[in-house]
């Protein structure tokens, strides 16, 4: 494993302790590297504390057990108000507009690396913060800091962190980004940490394991409508466009259609004006393919971004294979991206994140698709 700095004696790091194995091992590794380590547990969601799916109390208990085992302090903080204002309201507004947002990216931007960093600075007098994300940072000789993909390609989380500023990356440490996931679990087991075999969290951060349709229906009124084929034939009913995303295959309720081949049905479009869900057969249906996209709300980790005409790679969703592309700036905040080959299920509202080799450059929000 690569050390983060040559010497760290006396430097204070506040680790975001989630009650999971990644943050647990992050705290241990930083202690081994000579940092003065303390933990901070965030509570970001007030609702449903008695819900069977809400594990906040259990997570706090596990975080405390790990900190006790390591002999470090654990602080707690409630960011529920900030979360509601800066993450959840954005989430609802995007769904209401017919887009598919990624609230975990907004959570990292507004909560984990903003509210958390401010609290660590102002209240806990931190030199650095640290998280259990699978990314790396690289400090260059010219004083710049870059964010790199995590060593574990299957766990790399740079896609979710592209909105971080250069300053935020420079103040953050990512110890497990240098490791494979199995190595992290092995370290936790060797150290006797209670989280060593705890399963990874899944789902949107504030929804957890709950059924998405039930949760969203509590906040946005559903508007049922027709499901049509790309040729205009009505073949079913949907419960609300907000419950569906481009490329979706499961949960459409239209299996076994007469006069159709055996290819599965996919969502290929959402007609907001008519409240119609458009479907087609096959994962490479023409209506599902894009030759490029317009990306806005641009953010570059190094502030300046890639040069006009750059040939780099992009991801339009998490764990997607790299997509070679060429960039053209339409203005300071809008980028035209042309793919080398057509790509399926590019989804407005999701994030497009750009890479030059192992360096995460930044990205933006997918606004429009380029077809034909």
Curated annotation (Swiss-Prot):
Any single GO CC term annotated in Swiss-Prot or TrEMBL for this entry: cytoplasm
InterPro entries reported for this sequence: MnmA-like, MnmA-like_C, MnmA-like_central, MnmA-like_central_sf, Rossmann-like_a/b/a_fold
Residues the UniProt record annotates as site (Interaction with tRNA): 133, 350
CDD domains: MnmA_TRMU-like (cd01998)
Matches recorded under Gene3D superfamilies: Adenine nucleotide alpha hydrolases-like domains (2.30.30.280), HUPs (3.40.50.620), Translation factors (2.40.30.10)
Intrachain disulfide bonds: 107-205
Residue segments, region Interaction with target base in tRNA: 102-104
GO molecular function terms noted in the UniProt entry: ATP binding; tRNA binding; tRNA-uridine 2-sulfurtransferase activity
Residues at which ATP binds: 16-23, 42, 132
Family: Belongs to the MnmA/TRMU family.
Role: Catalyzes the 2-thiolation of uridine at the wobble position (U34) of tRNA, leading to the formation of s(2)U34.
Protein name: tRNA-specific 2-thiouridylase MnmA
Organism encoding this protein: Shewanella sp. (strain MR-4)
